[in-house]
Amino acid sequence: MLKTIKKIIKLQIKGGLANPAPPIGPALGSAGVNIMDFCKQYNFSTQKSKGKLLPVIITIYNDKSFSFIIKEPPVSKQLLELCKLDKGSKESNKIKVGKITLAKIESIAKNKIIDMNCFNIKSAISMVAGTARSMGIEIL
């Protein structure tokens, strides 16, 4: 029998740290999903990325079963992590808060290209570089 999709939920959850508290509990509880079952499966799947903020797309079916897809961390979070910053610049065109090399931007683009809306590495690098510039990070 073919399962029909009841709801699709997009969340950002820290890897290995899912628990029934908000935002996970209310989002899944309203759809009738076993919250603890999701948390156990998610935490098991994200053991290697413990503590990193990971986007997840949860598909809930009519029989209250679910599946989920874990994506790469957001580009902005990866840039902040590599530059060892807490947040980006308030005025990115005037105040520069960090520096990053083109090689590091390329490595982020290679990891994130599967989640991006582009077809080649050159455009992915351009997107990551644009994000860095808008955060006030200087590209070397």
Swiss-Prot record:
Q: Name one GO molecular function term.
A: structural constituent of ribosome
Give the highest taxon in the source lineage.
Answer: Bacteria
Record CDD domains? Ribosomal_L11
List, in alphabetical order, the GO biological process terms annotated in this UniProt record: translation
Pfam families, per database record: Ribosomal_L11 (PF00298), Ribosomal_L11_N (PF03946)
Keywords attached to this Swiss-Prot or TrEMBL record, sorted alphabetically, are:
Methylation, Ribonucleoprotein, Ribosomal protein, RNA-binding, rRNA-binding
Modification after translation: One or more lysine residues are methylated.
**Which residue windows are coiled coil?**
none
Annotated signal peptide: none
Q: Which InterPro entries match?
A: Ribosomal_uL11 (IPR000911), Ribosomal_uL11_bac-typ (IPR006519), Ribosomal_uL11_C (IPR020783), Ribosomal_uL11_C_sf (IPR036769), Ribosomal_uL11_N (IPR020784), Ribosomal_uL11_N_sf (IPR036796)
Question: NCBIfam families recorded for this chain?
Answer: L11_bact
Similarity remark: Belongs to the universal ribosomal protein uL11 family.
This protein is called Large ribosomal subunit protein uL11
Provide the species name.
Karelsulcia muelleri (strain GWSS) (Sulcia muelleri)
Organism lineage reads as: Bacteria, Pseudomonadati, Bacteroidota, Flavobacteriia, Flavobacteriales
